[in-house]
A protein has these predicted regions:
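Short N-proximal segments of mature Sec-exported proteins
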Residues: 22-194, 198
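Bacterial N-terminal signal peptides
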Residues: 3-14
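Short, solvent-exposed mixed-charge patches
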Residues: 208-209
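Sec/Tat signal peptide C-region and signal peptidase I cleavage site
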Residues: 15-21
Length: 209
């Protein structure tokens, strides 16, 4: 879908003021709805610059969509966890997005969970999470938050998706990333010499550390 290419190339332009977004259950959301309602273009509804309509008052607006690029990043992290891997592929986001798009086009009625766990994107430039010191990661991430907050957030969304994939859940809560980031920061502060993979595993299974 051409819209995905625009999303990947213009990610910074897509980050807007955030409002509470609805949770997404990958086991019940169809590929078709994902393509059209989550990452697809808006359906041409009225904008703030349009004249105020006359007639009956419109129904309350639906919950806003989660940010598209961050959604794809979350799904990418989730899929890597589900595949049993512990690496982050630094240049494979576009490959994952296009592979997911193709899978959903081929099986529009399939669940998003099925599609996400079926795609096999390129495995370019892997970074082993089990070899990355958690304290080192948190220090780098803090620098990134100061210098490039949008990129820092997308990386955190990948890690959030990865942790949810490890936990066995299949629900994406777009507004849960801040809580997750705070928990990760606290764990890294308490266990700076542990690997990022070990800390993510602990976060995904509270009480099992």
């Amino acid at each position: 879908m051409a819209a995905l290419l625009v999303i990947f190339l213009g990610a910074a332009c897509l980050l807007a003021a955030r409002s509470p977004a609805a949770e997404i259950d990958l086991a019940t959301l169809s590929c078709d709805k994902y393509e059209n309602e989550i990452v697809g273009s808006p359906d041409g509804g009225q904008t703030s610059s349009d004249p105020v309509p006359k007639g009956p008052v419109a129904a309350p607006a639906a919950p806003p969509r989660p940010d598209a690029i961050n959604t794809v990043m979350w799904l990418f992290g989730f899929s890597v966890a589900k595949a049993g891997e512990h690496v982050m592929y630094g240049e494979a986001l576009a490959s994952f997005g296009f592979a997911l798009d193709a899978e959903c086009r081929n099986e529009p009625g399939a669940t998003l969970l099925h599609a996400v766990t079926s795609v096999r994107p390129n495995r370019d430039k892997p970074m082993d999470l089990s070899a990355l010191n958690c304290g080192t990661f948190e220090s780098r991430h803090a620098d990134s938050v100061r210098t490039d907050p949008d990129s820092a957030r997308t990386i955190m969304m990948w890690l959030f998706g990865y942790a949810v994939g490890l936990s066995g859940s299949h629900v994406f809560d777009p507004d849960g990333v801040e809580r997750f980031a705070a928990g990760l920061k606290a764990e890294c502060a308490s266990n700076p010499n542990d690997s990022l993979f070990d800390v993510l595993s602990a976060l995904s299974r509270p009480g099992k550390r």
